[in-house]
Amino acid sequence: MERVERIIEFEIARINSHLPRARKSLKDLLNMEEPMITLRDGSVHYFKRQELELLASLLDEEEIAMLRLPMVLEISTVERDKIIIRGKVEAKVIRKILGFEEAIIEEPILKLPRYYLPKIRRILPTTTVHAFIVEW
């Protein structure tokens, strides 16, 4: 069984090769002439400036410095019908983008039905990325 688990983990790592090696703050990306990051597979991912500016318009200065991009939308093997967004600022942005009311308490984890994934990706195609998470 251990061999099968290693194979599955290898395949998940392969399908997640589009994830960033490191994320950058919205503030740093806004200050770059060509906002970009390097992905795990060595390729470069470019951010659309108008998308970065949209995100900045939703946040205050402190939050702009805190928001790390791209935001990771997790797809879990356990909660297959949900996507998970981690981070207080990230969750706030997604709630605003989807038109949800302000939360009374800002939670650091936001779980949404998976059918929101295409809508989020359509609105924020370069500042979000989905990741497949294996949980046993």
Curated annotation (Swiss-Prot):
Pfam families documented for this protein: DUF61
Family under the similarity heading: Belongs to the UPF0216 family.
Protein known as: UPF0216 protein PYRAB16100
Organism: Pyrococcus abyssi (strain GE5 / Orsay)
